[in-house]
Amino acid sequence: MCEIDLSNYHEPKPRRALQILWRVINATLFKMLVGSPLRDMRNLLLRAFGAKICWGSIVYPSCKIWAPWLLEIGKNSCVGPHVQLYNKAQITLGDNVVVSQGSFLCTASHDISDPRHSLVVAPILLDDGVWVAADSFIGMGVH
């Protein structure tokens, strides 16, 4: 069995203050904006934190988004209920994309060949018309 020493592990935390502010808003205000009439308000909140979201797209209030500033959503796309977007790298959804309920999109992992298990990231790009089935996992580097 391999022994792992993580005492020297360090992960850079760019935009730490912004990240903390967003996490508070995502866990509170964003989740309170329930219903179709408030979807534009949710999108405005995401845009205020740097997301690029085309009009006509829906992001459900129960979604958990790590970094809106690394998120781009095309026209008429939908990020369904309880979806998690762990985007330490860019996530781009094309036009008419559906990410169904409970799905997890993850742009990060750790390099297990490195004794320090350093963080590795790669973007996710879902082209126009992609449908991600419920409770799916989409890993880093998927295109």
Predicted features, each with a name:
Residues 55, 60-61, 66-67, 74-75, ...:
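Left-handed beta-helix
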Residues 1-51, 55, 129, 142:
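Terminal amphipathic alpha-helical/low-complexity segments used for targeting or macromolecular assembly
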Residues 110:
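Histidine-centered active-site/metal-ligand motif
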Residues 36, 48, 68, 88, ...:
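Residues at secondary-structure transition points
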Residues 113-115:
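A short acidic, helix-capping loop that chelates divalent metal ions and anchors anionic groups
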